[in-house]
């Protein structure tokens, strides 16, 4: 409500939350505007400045990371809570995930060290100066905590008999929203989750550096992988399906 749309910008009025969730939102320019967003005091407004453009809605897949901050900005606006407080109250604590805290880097060097440093991370969620958590990266989870989130998805949003996330949402987020993406190893995309096999309901959260939550609904299997920073990791799913999954399935048999 407190954002002023740039003069002449019309496309932004047609953009929905679903466009952001499915990476089909239109943006001005190519690539993520890391510097302009991350050096601003309000990352949500800075990201909104890049939303829209003259081409209008094309429904083309355009993977962005930093501009997803719009989603957490909307969440904070709607709930009147910080991202991490909302997650702790309604997701993490109910399923036994470690309680997380906000972390904000004061300098560019500190931000870089947080991203690429190999020292163990505390349970934190990277945030902007206003305390709004990043949506596309920066959530530090252990493999155990990642597996708990995967198990929640596997169980259609239920944990120990309690519905934490609606089964309808789990089904919708893991349903392809567009044809297989040639440039992304023929994977499909749902709501911020990669769909690996729509027929067998196999899907995955693939994060920064190749961190993965892999969910195989047919085989009732969840695999979580954590990793140090490495840019453009493309083989993590192959690693899981070629080495980890067969090993686990052999043990189950």
What do the PLM-derived regions correspond to, one by one?
Residues 202-253:
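Structured C-terminal helix/loop/strand segments within mature extracytoplasmic catalytic/sensor domains
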Residues 93, 102-111, 121-174, 178:
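Flexible, glycine-rich surface segments
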Residues 50-57, 67-69, 127-135:
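Flexible glycine/proline-enriched surface loops and loop-helix/loop-strand junctions
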Residues 1-62:
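Active-site-proximal loop and beta-strand segments within enzyme catalytic domains
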Residues 1-25, 78-136:
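Active-site helix/loop module of the DD-peptidase/beta-lactamase fold
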Residues 29-32, 76-88, 157-165, 234:
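Structural helix-adjacent loops and short alpha-helical linkers that scaffold large soluble proteins
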Residues 112-133, 172-223:
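Active-site Gly/Thr loop motif
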Residues 20, 61-92, 145-153, 220-223:
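Alpha-helical scaffold elements that line and support the substrate/ligand-binding pocket
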């Amino acid at each position: 409500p407190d954002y002023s749309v740039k003069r002449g910008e019309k496309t932004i009025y047609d953009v929905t939350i679903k466009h952001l969730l499915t990476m089909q939102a239109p943006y001005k320019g190519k690539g993520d505007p890391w510097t302009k967003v991350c050096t601003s005091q309000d990352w949500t407004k800075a990201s909104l400045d890049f939303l829209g453009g003259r081409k209008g809605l094309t429904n083309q897949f355009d993977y962005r990371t930093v501009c997803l901050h719009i989603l957490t900005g909307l969440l904070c606006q709607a709930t009147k809570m910080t991202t991490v407080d909302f997650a702790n109250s309604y997701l993490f604590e109910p399923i036994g995930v470690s309680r997380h805290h906000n972390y904000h880097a004061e300098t560019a060097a500190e931000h870089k060290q947080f991203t690429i440093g190999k020292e163990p991370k505390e349970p934190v969620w990277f945030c902007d100066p206003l305390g709004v958590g990043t949506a596309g990266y920066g959530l530090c989870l252990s493999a155990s905590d990642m597996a708990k989130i995967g198990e929640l998805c596997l169980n259609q949003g239920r944990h120990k008999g309690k519905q934490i996330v609606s089964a309808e949402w789990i089904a919708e987020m893991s349903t392809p929203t567009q044809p297989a993406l040639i440039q992304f190893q023929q994977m499909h995309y749902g709501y911020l989750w990669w769909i690996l096999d729509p027929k067998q309901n196999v899907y995955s959260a693939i994060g920064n550096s190749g961190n993965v939550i892999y969910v195989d609904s047919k085989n009732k299997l969840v695999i979580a992988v954590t990793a140090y920073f490495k840019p453009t990791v493309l083989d993590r799913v192959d690693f899981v399906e070629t080495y980890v999954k067969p090993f686990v399935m052999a043990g189950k048999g």
